[in-house]
Amino acid sequence: MPSAVATVVGMNDMTTLHDAIGDFPRRKAQTLRFSCGAPRSATAIGDGSRVLFLRSDGPEDLVTSLWLSVFDADGTHREVLLADPRVLLADADDEDVPAEEKARRERAREGGSGIVSYSVDAAGRRVVFTINGQLFLTEIAEDGSGRTRMLAADGIAAGEGATPVLNPRISPDGRHVAYTTGEHLMLVDIAPQWPSGSRHDDATDDDCDGQLPPHAHGHRCGDEESGAPYDPSADKLSTLWSVYPDDDADENTWKIGLAEFVAGEEMDRYDGFWWGPDSRHIIFETFNAAPEPMWYISDPANPQTPASGRRYARALTSNADVRLTLAELAYDGHDEYAGLGIQQISWNRKDYEYVAAVHWSADHEPLLLVQNRRQTRDQVLSVHLGSEASAGSAPVGSTTVLEEHANDQWLDIIQGTPAFTPDGRLVCALNDMDADTNRLTVDGRPFTPAGWQVREVLDVTDEDVLAVVQRTPELDGYEAPDGLSPWRGNADGHDARSFDVVSFDYDGNVLPMTARPGSWSASRRGEGLVVSGRDMDSAKSVMSHSFTMRPVDGGAVPENDGDGSAAMSTLVCPIDNHAAEPGFAPNVRFARLGEHRLYTAIIAPSADSPYAKADRLPVLLKPYGGPGFQQVVFNQAYYWDAQWWADQGFLVVTADGRGTTGRGPRWDREIFENMKDVTLADQVEAVHALAQAVEELNRGTAQDGDASRIPAPDLDKVCMIGWSYGGFLSALAVLDAPDVVKAACAGAPPTDWTLYDTHYTERYLGLDPAAYERNSIIADAPKLARPLMLIHGFADDNVTIAHSLRLSQALMAAGRPHTFLPLTGITHMTNDPVVAENLLTLQRDFLRDALDL
């Protein structure tokens, strides 16, 4: 089972472990949590011998570039810089990001700059992305080199309504790019000839402003019909479709091509339009946010700045009105846009208002996953594309129900499902309550084994499904066939704490793609696989490109000399990581605590800490503790903050209670309509079981001088810190369990669940207002008898500062002293490096004073 004792790692300029840990807050802030310089966002392309990825130049460089990992025909591996934002734009370091793009990045928790996302065509030859609102195209040559230019630069700059450029997606054939401005869905026809200069200016008509009548089909700015001659080196910009810009004089509540707020925040669906595999069809979303309440985010430190208003899907109120439209594009002889036909996609929107997923694979009709408001029922729908004139055929845009699912509490969304296999079988997710397993089905038949919790589907073929899974060993009845032993006897380390990439065939056989327990994901194409993630052994994230190379002209295939992270591949090469390291490995032990056998991490002071040989230490509980997210995982980065806290003189404990996923659908649903009581009870259970667990971990170690010995917990001095749900749990602990938790720091706590969004909150609390009253903590304010610090950002549009303000107001009304740190300009991500650094020390000093340390 992975564990670690704190040691000095990778810090040539620091001679002691104590120095490295002491400098951690500053270095964490400077390096964007040690992520700068690390490769990320990998996509295998072509035959799998190539992988696209993003990476900045160094440990403090926020500007990410586009790179290519290449295996040449002789097996040589190279990394090729395809597009550098600083070369393409002089002001790449000074980002001017549109408000809509900032919102998308906030939903995706994106903290970088430069090229932060990209779209690639089916052949892996063309890639599009934005930098500072400008649209760029990179073409990849046979030798792996690339050339990059702006697309439709003058047309986008000059056309009214053509900006901002949001979510550009290249067509599968690589000839067109669609993007949205929020009000217009735009199309760029890529010139077949590369312009002579690095920047190409698109010709436009002076009288063409890019505007369209509401919901009228588009036309080209500067097209041939207006007299402009065809130019094979000129990109053409067209408006495909627009939403109503004049519904409201002050606010356009209609949006096109964007995902509504709850889709991005809670469903992990960030796209609002989808190309068809034939590059002639597009499904696009339009939504009207007018039914949602209007909320305002203000900046009190700058009273001259007006408050920013936006619609917010508040729990127990109305959602946005979401619609889908199918567009069929026509092209002329030059493969340039010549018009379109559209048809609304019809389904039972009244009963199934959430569009959870859209998936469209080659040679098949598009698939939709729609949910009812309570998320207790869903439908998998196919969208009909055929001609209305065909005898007996269903109308274009109509849908057919392929599968339906139900659950008394809620249904989980498993990313990557539903999906067709190439030969037409339907792969769906199943919350199998009888087997207590989140499984996959093919044409309605479960085929993944019991005890293997599927978290995400990465790829679907006729032979297998590539997926991210967590094992529940106590449920796992799977017996590997002869010659196939998952993890070769290392299965005990692969449990709820490990996110493993495996291949399932449709008979339920399992082939692991990752060898070490950790937090892994992957992308697969052809004979290539790129695996990325973290484990407990390395401070840096790992990205490994593997490719099965066939012998050429009788030559031998090189032997696999990799680390086993992609066991079935022949060639394996790591992708360089230029990130900084914190300079220490955390001193963490893992245990199972209490009646519920809670997965728990216990982090003790490092060997250099003055507290290393203490007999006993105060306890710092550091949970998330809420539904849908785990913190006790085999990922070293999860424990760096905890190690800093341990070296301040605390025994740090993180326990994953009921609802935190990874242990089956029953475990997840034990919090239903009772999050408050259940999640707090599990933290209290962990405290009560802690002393015995530490005794057992120390059994066999010397009492003095042994670095592996853990100081005993001082259960009279227990405190808690947390952010988001962890902040809620921290405030709740000093309100409802003051005999156990004696002080708390609560960051961005959702104190009143009626102020949080629909999709998340109603999944766990349902639609009964009484459940919200029971699970909120405002009414508990008069019970406060322990020190409490509230921390909240004014710019937080996810958990708004109203949560902390309402609790503070109730505490004031009850005469209960407390501390409140309002953060100007800070969102839910705490993205200011100075604030992030100082928050740690301010919380430390508060807790030391509160516990009289």
Spans of features found by a protein language model:
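Conserved alpha/beta-hydrolase "acid-adjacent" motif
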Residues: N798-R806
